[in-house]
């Protein structure tokens, strides 16, 4: 069967210009998902195209992804990224992946040993918030998580990311090998501290001495990642195959924009990512806040209210004058004033975001962005609301966004159609929705302390604002509620 590794590709396709034989598995990456393929791996590929070198990536997937890994091997670890701009496309073959391992195809033992090879300098992760096994209420390791329970009972055969990292670091220490940097690339706040808490929490349970060694010798840099990467669909794979003249089951489509801000704290070296435009900084937090509130906050706002209004894609929302105006107003009037970042033109940043959201070539589903809202709301909307509450400034669009989430998870859109709600707390949410009338819905959902904390549900101003926004949506529908809030 022909693959991208076995055919002559069209001239417009950008193929690797470096010697892939020189690559070693110096980066081991957990989670060969769409985002990683279009972001960290692609940026590493750019560095290799610019200056060569041996910074190859070994991709790891544990208990799923075996079919994708088999397909990747069949095409010599090459895959395609299609960058879709409003003005045209770029087709890129990424060659930075050197090998891949999967627990089903290979073995857990082989995976753990891979982390222990001397050349491994960085272990990076895109495993989503759930993969870190952290208790969201405390930020500490969740010792009630079934995988963590398993790993503490059988530490040499771990099933969780924290368990595998600790076992690998333990073995490296025993063998006299240098430790590696642990680099979280997930779109979660303070991701360096999240993975550090998970690893140290697991290590403390196993050996306080080992935990002390990890604390002293391993670094956990923070990162801010930004690129819109919709999930692959049959349609997107067919479109890419038309560019290539051959099928690539590992291919992914994305927008042209890409940004990666990384805390420059690596214990065993790193690729020269700055050559690929990566911003290496001392403190990621201001950048992270800017992105989470201005981009992700407005994305979630558009996802809930847009879906309720019958818009399937973010770009569809942006064709609507009210939604476009609301997104920009939310960014600049309600989110920007809460930020600490200096020397960034936030108006220019907002205008770029609006243009990215409006990109008609990207079919980014409102339903996809609406997933896992209980984990996203705290940093995307509630953090900004807390600042406004303290200052007594206006946050009426943020209130509408929170009420939009409540209406969305209630399971019916404005046309009366059922919504397929995907959320880690979906069982709990379903129970609260079923047990409350429309008038009681806000109070019922505010009882989710893991989302709203203890402070907001006890704040009468907050509760009143959300109830008013809820009533607007229930009475008039999401689109008219938006117009009423904007007073247009």
Curated annotation (Swiss-Prot):
**Annotated EC:** 1.-.-.-
**GO: which molecular function terms?**
oxidoreductase activity, acting on the CH-OH group of donors, NAD or NADP as acceptor
Domain of life here?
A: Bacteria
Q: Record-annotated residues binding NAD(+)?
A: 27-38
Is the keyword NAD in the record? yes
Q: Name one Pfam family in it.
A: Mannitol_dh
Q: Its GO biological process terms?
A: mannitol metabolic process
Query: What SUPFAM superfamilies does the entry give?
Result: 6-phosphogluconate dehydrogenase C-terminal domain-like, NAD(P)-binding Rossmann-fold domains
Keyword check for Electron transport, yes or no: no
Q: Which UniProt keywords apply?
A: NAD, Oxidoreductase
Question: Which protein family is it in?
Answer: Belongs to the mannitol dehydrogenase family. UxuB subfamily.
Q: Which NCBIfam families match?
A: PRK15037.1 (NF011611)
- List the protein's name: Uncharacterized oxidoreductase YeiQ
């Amino acid at each position: 069967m022909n693959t991208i590794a076995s055919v002559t590709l069209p001239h417009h396709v950008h193929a690797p210009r470096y010697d892939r034989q020189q690559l070693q598995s110096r980066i081991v990456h957990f989670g060969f998902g769409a985002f990683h393929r279009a972001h960290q791996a692609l940026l590493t590929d750019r560095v290799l195209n610019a200056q060569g070198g041996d910074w190859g990536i070994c991709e790891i997937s544990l208990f799923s992804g075996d079919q994708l890994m088999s397909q990747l091997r069949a095409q010599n670890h090459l895959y395609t990224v299609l960058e879709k701009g409003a003005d045209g496309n770029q087709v890129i073959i990424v060659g930075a992946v050197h090998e891949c391992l999967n627990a089903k195809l290979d073995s857990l033992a082989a995976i753990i040993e891979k982390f222990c090879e001397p050349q491994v300098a960085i272990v990076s992760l895109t495993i989503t918030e759930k993969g870190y096994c952290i208790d969201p209420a405390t930020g500490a390791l969740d010792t009630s998580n079934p995988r963590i329970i398993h790993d503490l009972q059988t530490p040499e055969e771990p099933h969780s990311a924290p368990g595998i990292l600790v076992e690998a670091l333990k073995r490296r220490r025993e063998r006299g090998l240098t430790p590696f940097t642990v680099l979280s690339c997930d779109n979660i706040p303070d991701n360096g501290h999240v993975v550090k808490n998970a690893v140290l929490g697991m290590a403390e349970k196993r050996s306080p001495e080992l935990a002390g060694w990890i604390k002293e010798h391993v670094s956990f840099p923070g990162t801010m990642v930004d690129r819109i990467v919709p999930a692959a669909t049959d349609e997107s794979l067919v479109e890419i195959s038309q560019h290539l003249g051959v099928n690539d089951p590992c291919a992914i489509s994305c927008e042209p924009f890409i940004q990666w801000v990384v805390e420059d704290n690596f214990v065993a070296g790193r690729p020269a990512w700055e050559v690929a435009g990566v911003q290496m900084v001392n403190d990621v937090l201001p950048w992270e806040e800017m992105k989470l509130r201005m981009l992700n906050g407005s994305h979630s706002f558009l996802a809930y209210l847009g879906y309720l209004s019958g818009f399937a894609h973010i770009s569809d929302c942006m064709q609507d004058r009210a939604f476009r105006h609301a997104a920009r107003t939310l960014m600049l009037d309600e989110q920007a004033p809460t930020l600490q970042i200096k020397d960034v033109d936030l108006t220019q940043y907002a205008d770029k975001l609006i243009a990215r959201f409006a990109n008609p070539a990207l079919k980014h589903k409102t339903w996809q962005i609406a997933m896992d809202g209980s984990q996203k709301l705290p940093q995307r909307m509630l953090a900004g609301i807390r600042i406004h509450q303290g200052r007594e400034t206006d946050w009426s669009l943020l209130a509408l966004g929170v009420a939009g989430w409540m209406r969305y998870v209630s399971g019916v859109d404005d046309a009366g159609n059922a919504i397929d709600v995907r959320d880690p707390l979906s069982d709990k949410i379903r129970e609260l929705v079923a047990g409350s009338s429309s008038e009681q819905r806000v109070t019922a959902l505010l009882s989710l302390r893991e989302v709203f904390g203890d402070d907001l549900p006890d704040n009468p101003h907050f509760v009143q604002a959300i109830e008013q926004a809820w009533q607007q949506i229930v009475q008039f529908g999401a689109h008219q509620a938006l117009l009423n809030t904007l007073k247009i």
